[in-house]
């Protein structure tokens, strides 16, 4: 077993012990094995299970080197945890990614890597098991497990900055400014704005992408949607001249 602890237990053995002793598997789930493994476990124990929607880790920060200019230089330990304990970060945004890669080091499955151009972690969806190790490793809580979505399609706010709009935008050009325009166009009431930042409830989101088009800063991201081809311009029919 992976012994990643994504199930909430210390390891695979502890999970197995709990599953055997439990009256059902409602509170026991292995994110690495997923529904297929849980079906096999349930069959052995004589239980029934409800399938769960696949999850994936999402990095809720778009503070790239371009969007979020550095204001100072950090020369200490290359650890996000240590860095966060010393100061707010080397940019004007105290909420964003610190860029040291604690999440990458925490991932046992090689699903995370640091992008040298953006300075942000990138999730490989084909390798992510939604074990949650990266979520626990991030001292800024910018990584979240979200519903993977149909055909991998999902919409989320890539920002956690709780400062007022003017301050947040000054620190990062891609920050959510809490204007609420996204919430106003959402017919499914999936978006709320609290503490100056918007959040999309993936259990309510219908993937209409109206909020994406409405966001003035580009803080809302849409992932894995098919690229629509532009409609061809209508061809004007030439009128035949009547020479009489």
Report each predicted region and the residues it spans.
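Ferredoxin-type iron-sulfur electron-transfer modules and their immediate structural context
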Residues: 1-185, 214, 218-244
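Strongly charged, low-complexity linkers/loops
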Residues: 181, 191-193, 197-199
């Amino acid at each position: 077993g992976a012994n990643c602890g994504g199930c909430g237990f210390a390891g695979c053995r502890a999970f197995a012990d709990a599953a055997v002793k439990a009256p059902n598997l409602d509170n026991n789930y292995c994110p690495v094995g997923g529904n297929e493994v849980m079906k096999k476990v349930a069959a052995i124990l004589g239980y029934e299970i409800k399938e769960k929607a696949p999850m994936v880790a999402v990095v809720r920060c778009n503070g790239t080197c371009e969007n979020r200019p550095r204001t100072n230089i950090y020369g200490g330990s290359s650890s996000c945890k240590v860095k966060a304990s010393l100061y707010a970060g080397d940019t004007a945004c105290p909420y964003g990614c610190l860029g040291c890669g604690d999440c990458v080091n925490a991932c046992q499955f090689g699903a995370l890597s640091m992008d040298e151009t953006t300075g942000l972690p990138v999730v490989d969806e084909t390798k992510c098991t939604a074990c949650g190790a990266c979520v626990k490793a991030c001292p800024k809580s910018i990584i979240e497990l979200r519903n993977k979505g149909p055909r991998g399609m999902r919409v989320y706010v890539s920002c956690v900055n709780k400062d007022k709009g003017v301050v947040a935008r000054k620190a990062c050009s891609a920050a959510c400014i809490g204007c609420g325009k996204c919430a106003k166009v959402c017919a499914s009431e999936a978006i709320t704005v609290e503490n100056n930042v918007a959040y999309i409830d993936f259990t309510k989101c219908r993937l209409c992408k109206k909020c994406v088009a409405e966001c003035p800063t580009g803080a809302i991201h849409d992932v894995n949607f098919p690229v629509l081809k532009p409609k061809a311009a209508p061809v004007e029919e030439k009128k035949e001249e009547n020479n009489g």
